[in-house]
UniProtKB/Swiss-Prot annotation:
GO terms for cellular component: plasma membrane. Keywords: Cell membrane, Membrane, Transferase, Transmembrane, Transmembrane helix. Coiled coil: none annotated. Its main location: membrane. Catalyzes the transfer of the diacylglyceryl group from phosphatidylglycerol to the sulfhydryl group of the N-terminal cysteine of a prolipoprotein, the first step in the formation of mature lipoproteins. The gene is lgt. A 1,2-diacyl-sn-glycero-3-phospho-(1'-sn-glycerol) binds at residue 141. This is Phosphatidylglycerol--prolipoprotein diacylglyceryl transferase.
Length: 315
């Protein structure tokens, strides 16, 4: 019997009147808010404004969440598609199942298109959000803790995770493989949600540190490439500790393949940007010019609106 362990929460949702509030959703929401705060702080240093980030967030985040959900459903089709699954389950996001790789892919594409539409330099937007993403992901992982999901193999380590939900053990790959399920009351499991939280927070700190230390040497976009490399590397080993059911291709879990691809893409992007990437200072000057133009138009529109209101009062 292990005397030291990490307990699981005794609840994953609560009621406020007729509404059911899921902790999984709260964790994701808090993560998004913290990420927006970090992103805004860094974006302003480049010469941007909060309104620019707010508009970008309102466009990008919903698309990223849809991408995260669809990626999860596509890579674990048994629960969502016939003959074994139900399409209605795709809509049950409160039960968990948001794959960050899908969110990153769709979110990056939408952010790129939006920045292009608004004439914002995407490379420094990517750098600004680089440490914000892993922080948001770290906070979001707490949702897996509340749902008692995505844990790892059995362990005797003093930081092992203790489950208190009989249904939680059925979510593991051990049961899917036909082996006897371990007794959740006496077995501890690797808290992979915690491993990823720590890994992500270290990554965010490293990106901020290196971005400051190497400010004169880095090209615009290289900090985002660091994020891709760090997260891809981390998910490669963390994914091999997890035992939730996952589609296996050529002996490796789907997310391991995706993590490897993300890591390689990050390496390639880092090298290419080092050779051909834009100068961050030039990009910042471009953003400052766009911001000044937006503020001028906004001032003109506000003045026109004020004059219209004044004209109505004098009639």
């Amino acid at each position: 019997m292990n005397l030291a362990y990490i307990p699981s929460p005794t609840f994953s949702k609560f009621e406020i009147g007729p509404f059911t509030i899921h902790m999984y959703a709260i964790c994701i929401l808090i993560g998004i808010c913290v990420a927006v705060w970090i992103l805004t702080t860094r974006w302003k240093r480049y010469g941007g404004t909060f309104d620019q980030i707010l508009d970008t967030t309102l466009v990008t985040v919903p698309c990223a969440l849809v991408g995260a959900r669809l990626y999860h459903c596509i890579t674990t089709p048994a629960d969502y598609f016939p003959p074994t699954g139900n399409l209605v389950n795709i809509l049950k996001v409160w039960e968990g199942g948001m794959a960050i790789f899908g969110g990153i892919s769709v979110g990056t594409l939408v952010a790129f298109l939006w920045c292009r539409h608004k004439h914002y330099p995407f490379a420094i937007f990517a750098d600004a959000i680089a440490p914000a993403l892993p922080v948001a992901q770290a906070i979001g992982r707490l949702g897996n803790w509340f749902n008692q999901e995505l844990y790892g193999w059995p362990t005797t380590l003093p930081w092992g995770l203790k489950l208190n939900d009989a249904d939680a053990i059925g979510k593991s790959e051990i049961c899917y493989s036909g082996a006897q399920c371990p007794d959740y009351r006496t077995t501890l499991f690797h808290p992979t949600f915690l491993y990823e939280m720590i890994w992500n927070l270290i990554g965010a700190a490293l990106i901020i540190y290196l971005g400051h230390k190497l400010a004169d040497r880095l090209k615009a976009g290289q900090q985002f490439a660091m994020y891709l490399m760090w997260y891809g590397l981390g998910r490669t080993w963390i994914e091999n500790v997890r035992i939730n059911y996952s589609t296996v291709i050529l002996g490796l879990r789907t997310n391991v393949w995706t993590a490897i691809i993300v890591f390689v893409l990050g390496c390639i992007l880092f090298v290419v940007l080092y050779q051909y990437g834009p100068d961050p200072k030039a990009q910042a000057r471009g953003l400052a010019a766009v911001t000044a133009d937006e503020l001028e138009r906004q001032s003109i529109e506000e003045e026109q609106l004020r004059q219209k209101k004044q004209a109505k009062r004098t009639k």
